[in-house]
Amino acid sequence: MNNNILEIIIPIYNEGPKVLKLMELFKKNIKINFKILFCYDDVTDNIFDYQDELKKFDFDIEFIKNPSQGPCSAIKEGFSVGVSDCVIVYPCDDLINVELINEMYNLFLNGKHIVAASRFMKGGSMKGCPLIKSILVRSASFTLYHLSSIPIKDASNGFRLFSRKL
């Protein structure tokens, strides 16, 4: 295992323009060594139209073909290909929370094996979220937290850090 680098799995589906914005934020905010694993469904994905622009960031980037389709399968493939002791799953459309990556990694270094970002903690928010979606997300998360053994208060948020020790 490579324990001195963070791998960031980003499931993508025709996210080209968003990826460039996200990479700008990564460059500005992430203060630790990291590698990006872009997990895509199909070779026609528009991410490949942006490869030259991505090279300008000088990041360690690997493109991983999803053997199936959808974000769940893409994340699983990212985990199977990755080698780091610490992996973050980051939603490509989250242009707000990049700075939390450093904090989450520090929690990992201090012994945490799972770190889940939450929109329901102090300082968290669901900016721009339609009311009905907000109600559904909050209700589902509340129910899962109280009726299951999962100690996560924001079950539908895809932004998480995992230790390979699990």
Regions found by a protein language model. Name each.
Residues I5-E7, K35:
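Cell-envelope/extracellular polymer assembly enzymes that use nucleotide-activated donors
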Residues I10-I12, Y40:
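Short beta-strand/turn micro-motifs composed of small residues
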Residues E15-K18, V43, P71, N97:
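Donor nucleotide-sugar binding loop of glycosyltransferases
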Residues E15-K28:
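Short, well-formed alpha-helical segments that are part of the catalytic scaffolds
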Residues M23, N33-V43, I64-K65:
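Short beta-strand/loop segment that forms part of the nucleotide-sugar
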Residues Y40-D49, D94:
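A conserved acidic beta->alpha catalytic loop
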Residues F57-I61:
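A short helix-to-beta-strand connector/capping loop
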Residues N66-V81, C86-V89, V98-L166:
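Acceptor/aglycone-binding surface of glycosyltransferases and processive sugar-polymer synthases
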